[in-house]
Regions:
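Beta-strand/loop substructures that line and gate deep hydrophobic ligand-binding cavities in soluble
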Residues: 89-143, 152-154
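Short, highly charged C-terminal tails/helix-capping segments
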Residues: 43, 148-161
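Hydrophobic pocket/interface hotspot
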Residues: 20-25, 31, 56-58, 74, ...
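A short, structured loop/turn motif at beta-sheet edges
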Residues: 18-19, 48-50, 75-80, 100-109, ...
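Short, surface-exposed coil-to-beta transition loops
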Residues: 7-9, 67-71, 93-97
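Short, cysteine-centered beta-strand-loop-beta hairpins and adjacent loop/turn segments enriched
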Residues: 62-68, 118-122
């Protein structure tokens, strides 16, 4: 079992305003369009949008293996600047996922990152590796993050029609 990096960040330039990009990344109901791993999300516990404390259910599936779900909680909702959520629970540890936007000469610099605040239990890591057949989770996450940002970029730069 290869040890996973505790943090990683990827970025992309987007020819759209930070507010436009924020609207895309903070609409968790669209995450299935962007992410190769997160297949669908919906707000739960009465939440209707991205505000700190709001929770949503995320259904994930790697390229191989079964699907799984979790219930992240929004920790930052700063329009045009940052959207972040925490995924945590018994045995699975805690990971904070962030999308940061900053104005750039081409529109917006968008970065996606994760930080493992508390690692999952070794047994959970082993089981995840076996079920998903992913030997290098760090490389897999990095590739998925880059694909996610590219899909968001394409959506942000495509005129609504």
């Amino acid at each position: 079992m290869k040890e996973r990096a505790q943090t990683d960040t990827v970025g992309i330039e987007v020819a759209a305003t930070p507010e436009t990009v924020y609207a895309l990344v903070s609409d968790i109901t669209q995450m299935g369009r962007w992410s190769p791993e997160c297949r669908e999300c919906h707000w739960i516990d009465g939440a209707t949008g991205p505000t700190p404390g709001a929770r949503f259910k995320a259904v994930n599936r790697a390229e191989k293996g079964p699907s799984w779900s979790n219930k992240p909680q929004v920790v930052v909702a700063d329009p045009g600047h940052e959207f972040a959520f925490s995924r945590k629970g018994p045995g699975i540890g805690e990971v904070i996922w962030r999308y940061r936007m900053s104005a750039s000469s081409t529109g917006t610099r968008l970065e996606e990152s994760y930080e493992i605040v508390k690692p999952p239990a070794k047994a959970v890591m082993w089981l995840t590796e076996k079920l998903t057949r992913i030997d290098d989770r760090t490389a897999d996450l990095n590739g998925s993050m880059n694909a996610t940002l590219e899909r968001i970029r394409q959506a942000a730069e495509t005129p609504a029609g």
